[in-house]
Amino acid sequence: MTEKQGQSGHMPIVSSSHLASNEAMTLSEFEYALTMMNNAFQRWMQSCSTTSGMSELSPLDILVVHNIYHRNRPKRIADVAFTLNIDDLHTVSYSVRKLAKLELVTSVRQGKDTFYNITPNGEAFCNHYRDVREQCLVEALKTMNINDQLGDVATLMRTLSGFYDQASRAVRSL
C-alpha cells in the first residue's frame, strides 16, 4: 500500500488535490464522485426528458414538474423548494412559470397563496418519463442487484446533506 492509497488499499480519485489532505482524502473522493454523479444524473434527466418530448426542460424544471405531480396534490413554490432543498425561491419560481407556459402545470389561487397542479399534458409527460426511465435505467440497474444498497446510499446521502447544511451555516459565522 502506497502512502497515497487509502486504508481500503485503493487509490483515491479526487478533482482537487489541494483539498485532499490526509484527514480529508475520503471526503474529497466522495465529493468528486458526488460531482460526477450529479452531472451524470442531470445529463440523464435531460436525455430522458428529450425522449419524452420535452427537450426544452432544464434539470431543475424536470425535478419541479415531477415534484408538483408527486401524490397529485397542489403545491406552493415554497413547498417545492423546501422539498428539493433549494434556498433560492426565484429559481423555482422561474421554473414553475416556464412549466406553466409549456402547459405542464397550472396555478390556482387560494386566499393569499398560489398553488400549482399538474395538467393532463404534465401528467402525460411525467408518465412517459417514468416509462422511459424504467425501460432504460431501472432495467439496467436490475442486473446489478443493488436495490437494497441504493436505499442505504440514499439514507446516507440525506444524512450527509444535513452535515453540509450545518457546515454551511457554521462557515457564515467565521
Feature locations, PLM:
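N-terminal leader segment of winged-helix/HTH proteins
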Residues: 1-55
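Alpha-helical linker/hinge and terminal dimerization helices associated
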Residues: 37, 41, 129-144, 156-170
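N-terminal helix-turn-helix DNA-binding core of bacterial DNA-binding proteins
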Residues: 46-87
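Short glycine/proline-centered loop/turn elements that form peptide/ligand docking sites
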Residues: 54-58, 93, 98, 117, ...
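Canonical helix-turn-helix DNA-binding module
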Residues: 74-114
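Charged, amphipathic alpha-helical coiled-coil/dimerization segments
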Residues: 97-151
